[in-house]
């Protein structure tokens, strides 16, 4: 499952807010290699994103029609511009002339189309095809019910791409800034082994060049659309002896994410404190329900389990003081104006809801199994036992086995840590709760939700806050998930490193980063 995050990962996702080193773009001068403590590298293929670490790496190796600036706004990349029809259903992208892949081969509008169709092709088995589900015909293509020609993606000529949408989507320019939609060379096929280090071909600011022990070495791509990046070499540090803080203090790495419990003392350290920077959270952890089977096919039961939890009290107990209780699956950094989720708990109403659902005798619920892989679930489980009188059991397993379980038989209650694909509420509501979405793990289907979500997607700037507030109110009432916590991220940043800015969803675009001259 893509974009799921491990709680113990080297880097959590967030919006990196640096008080120093922000810049509008690359500056001249290569300087020394940048050593980024990233953890072991994963896939080299945008079709097979597994977690936040993959997203981070692929952002360096490939490019799409747009990219995100320091404010999280899309700006032209492979596309020089675009026109949007009055009804918001047709996007015409102007692809830049004379684009090249890193090996010098031409990159045209047909390569964009081919890359997107490969993502949607069920034979590929991509992990994130549903990012393009708003495109006409994409859902049927993903299901194997239609062919490439039925998808609303047309390369008119080398420099013109036309995309037709099922409904207006104000966030579509953000979608095409996500690595899953980035352009891969013609050698890409439906396997995961076509891309190798000894013959790497990409479209981004860097190329994967070699491994050095546990590190992956990235070299600047002179053929990148924005020109060769300022730093010639990135060391993708795969492992270290000891913790991230010790490695940074010893000068072994230049950029490292650190956990909140370290940040609490680092902030007071005379040497490290000035180099510590907070990141606004853009990850969400939540409890999900198998909504296809009793008792959680009944929204009253789901709502009861949600109302029983005083998250403002429980989250610090379970996740630590650096975590923030979540009232919505949409992180605060991308809340539209007027969006204010409710965190309130009401155990008495929760008990009444269970009674109304026919479970006055709690034993009729049976033993409710919670899969605790990824979250500290015990405080919540204790409340469900004590406040609701429900018999609870907790199961844990390896992360890999948990992913397999979500695909085949979701537990009655499961836990997920998630990073947004792009800075829009739709990146959470659509990809996690829309019917047919690969990451709708609880298989929730609700026509009223679909209607509200489509209305929010098409809302104008002055209406978007109210439209998504209506979506949130309905999701809160139906409770297909229980939002749990937003995880705060902290970074240690070497002196002289510039261009990190306010990078949305924690994705560090090293093509825009430089050292002081």
Pin down the residues of each PLM region.
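Gly/Pro-rich hinge or "lid" segments in bacterial periplasmic/extracellular proteins
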Residues: 149, 154, 165-229, 233, ...
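N-terminal lobe/hinge region of extracytoplasmic solute-binding protein
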Residues: 37-86, 117, 201, 507
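Ligand-site clamp/hinge motif
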Residues: 194, 214, 222-266
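Long beta-strand-rich cores associated with HINT superfamily self-processing modules
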Residues: 491-517
